Amino acid sequence: MTNSKVDDFTRLIKTGGSGMKFTEGYWEKNERANASYAMQAFTAEAIPGGMRIVSPFREINDRGGALDVGTITTEFTSIRKDIISVRSYHYEGYVKGEPRYELNEDPQETEVEITDSEAVMKAGRMTVRVDLKDFKITYEADGKVLTNIGFRNLGYMQYDRATLTKFPEPNYMAAQYQPYMVTELSLAPGECVYGLGERFTAFVKNGQVVDIWNEDG
């Protein structure tokens, strides 16, 4: 390799190349991402217009297991006929930093049933089913399974995390990082994921690979 090619290769490795942002494949985590995944639907409750579950980053089997563990809260609500809105967050802040716009909502009646083994919300033809034993969220339409979320499919990422310090520094008693929420949905052979808005990718998102040649791309 020439020096320029070696530099390009080194840069590709350090930045994760054109692969996934948080993982290298399914099992290997990117060294720049500190990942925490929802491992259990520990609590479930009905809320106005839907239901809410709280999922810790590890299974809680006794009181000691509830110490020093983060959580992801997920809310399911009906915003229009046959549409279920899903919102997941980790310790919601007072200030909304992400771009938001007003939605044209027409909330419908929902039915929520919570047992020892599962929590179910029905909104028209749509149903969301949460397994309270083994973490799994299943979405159904007219009784047919559409997709689901399971092991390591819902997570909170701390990207480029710098540990805190007790010295008078900018990160005094506060770790510095870029926070992200991630989720993955199961797909059957032949199913496609579509998307709009990106200028440099295909309309069908399955298995996309994005090559960027300019460093400022």
Identify the meaning behind each predicted range.
Residues 6-13, 19, 66, 89, ...:
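Catalytic and substrate-binding clefts that recognize carbohydrates or anionic sugar/phosphate headgroups
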Residues 2-4:
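Accessory regions of macromolecular translocation/handling assemblies
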